[in-house]
Design a protein with these regions (language model features):
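Outer-membrane beta-barrel "beta-signal"
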Residues: 394-414
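Sec-dependent N-terminal signal peptides
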Residues: 4-14
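Sequence/structural signature of outer-membrane beta-barrel proteins
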Residues: 32-40, 77-85, 116-129, 156-169, ...
Length: 414
């Protein structure tokens, strides 16, 4: 794989000197050291904390002329020390994060084909998940009309069979879809922006013997908007989920609103998000817990990723997240974020305890230069008696340091 990628890269560099309008080679080196003492799950009294360093290494090439744009990005993700020495088989092999071609049909319409990041608006439903070292991509075709309209189509298979089209990569419970279609429209005027999204996901179903048993289609639709109100900015979203998931009817919703006040040196925000859940005594045969699908979950509901990315509340009583944020800007290259959350159950719990806990998130950002940045984060979780057990540790925290280097290695224009 490495040999093939380097051969392709050298070919493109040589080719670019003859015909390219724009050609560039870029890299991304990102390390993150983490101390985990309650990240993603409650830490127990007899457990030992985890510490590790993981790394992302990407090498990308871009080519562009007046009608065609190409992008190839190879990446390898690994944890320091997870391969024995001397060189052995890599646990996480080199693969392509991006491999797409974008063709301009006319001055407005274009089509983008291949492995690509699909990210819109606040990334609540469709996002790049860049916090994850792996990121998130889709193998899809996206037809766009300027910045106004995007239509996406995807059909996934795990190979090239001669018979049948059963899809059994991952599982539906992890939102691995067999088919996806979406339509997103955006309108901007003055300082306002309003987006509409409709997405259909088809999930492969299986019977009790493991044989293919049709496809369940689940739909998600809603709006996202940004609106100025005097000296404030309102950011809001609302989504409704219906259809079927694993042969079960779905009826769920998401609502979020945040007021933001911003100056050159300071940003303050106050918001609330509601993700529907199911009452403990609800006997209806419906899924009522909202599924955030393919968004950047790390941006929402606390940096410790306990409630949704940690899978601790999906399929249960949902979540109400009341939060605030303050960003102090020290200079053009550094700032400090503080973001407290109060978590409550959206639906009724058997113990009648709606308060789930509080999380305090801190993040310092320092940009040393255009292509080198440092992030330092600390989060503290205070779970309530509703989710604690007798063996839950009194201290739930998480500390991390991330260095991100993104240089442009080579560029040529003609």
């Amino acid at each position: 794989m490495k040999k093939h990628f380097l051969t392709t890269l050298l070919f493109l560099v040589g080719f670019s000197t003859l015909v390219a309008q724009d050609f560039s080679v870029d890299a991304n080196f990102r390390t993150r050291s983490e101390y985990r003492h309650g990240q993603g799950r409650l830490f127990q009294k007899e457990e030992k904390p985890a510490f590790f360093v993981n790394q992302r290494a990407r090498l990308g090439t871009s080519y562009q002329n007046e009608w065609l744009e190409l992008r190839l990005t190879a990446q390898q993700i690994f944890t320091w020390g997870d391969a024995q020495q001397p060189q052995a088989e890599l646990k996480n092999h080199l693969g392509f994060f991006e491999a797409w071609a974008k063709m301009q049909i006319d001055e407005n319409w274009n089509v983008k084909l291949g492995r690509q990041v699909i990210s819109y608006d606040d990334e609540r439903i469709l996002g790049g998940l860049d916090w994850s070292q792996y990121g998130r991509f889709h193998d899809a075709a996206v037809i766009s009309y300027g910045d106004f309209l995007n239509i996406g189509l995807a059909f996934n298979q795990e190979g090239q069979p001669n018979v049948g089209n059963t899809y059994n990569v991952g599982s539906a419970s992890k939102n691995t879809y067999k088919t996806m279609q979406f339509l997103r429209a955006n309108k901007k005027w003055q300082d306002n922006s309003l987006s509409f999204l409709f997405i259909n996901n088809g999930f492969q179903d299986f019977d009790s013997s493991g044989k293919q048993d049709g496809v369940s289609n689940m739909q998600t639709t809603g709006f996202y908007g940004i609106f100025p109100i005097s000296s404030l900015m309102l950011e809001a979203s609302a989504y409704y989920q219906f259809g079927k998931f694993q042969k079960t009817s779905v009826l769920a919703y998401q609502l979020r609103a945040e007021l933001i006040y911003k100056t050159q040196e300071f940003t303050a925000g106050l918001g609330m998000e509601m993700l529907s859940g199911r009452d403990y005594d609800d006997t209806s045969a419906k899924i009522k817990s909202f599924n955030p699908l393919y968004g950047t979950a790390h941006k929402f509901n606390g940096h410790m990723d306990f409630y949704y990315l940690g899978q601790n509340l999906q399929g249960t009583t949902g979540l109400n997240d009341i939060y605030a944020k303050a960003i102090v800007k020290f200079n053009e290259k550094s700032n400090l974020l503080f973001m407290p959350h109060i978590f409550m159950s959206n639906a009724k719990r058997a113990d009648n305890k709606s308060y789930l806990g509080t999380e305090l998130d801190f993040m310092f950002t320092q940009q040393f230069r255009k292509d080198v940045g440092l992030n330092i984060g600390y989060s503290h979780h205070l779970p309530s008696d509703a989710i604690k057990t007798p063996i839950t540790h009194d201290m739930q925290n998480w500390f991390w340091v991330q260095l991100n280097i993104k240089p442009t290695l080579f560029t040529t224009k003609q």
